[in-house]
């Protein structure tokens, strides 16, 4: 059985809006070295395939991020935020049954494509929703449908 997902413009717009918040951030992947051991007073480093998202570049200040957010809000006729809430606490609000899971998986793929980010935390309110998200990732909703459109 092959699943076919209908692409909705508002889902793509939401993913684009999140990515646009970080406009000016270069594409970078980030691996790092880990201290593995000390022998005879010398520290030995070994290349370790560890991953993290590259930090936000200093040029992308909180003021610039807030300006990007306000521009997006104005374009959507949403009251502009007065200040950032925490360090980049972004919310996409959608009605039930309109494809939130698809939208944030699409957003993850877009953030990876634009900025090289590869680590994300998905927080859900219940076990049932977690299992649904897990299943969506298992059937490769993101890979099967996002890659066709990205």
Where do the protein language model's features map onto the residues?
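RecA-like P-loop NTPase motor core of helicase/translocase proteins
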Residues: 1-149
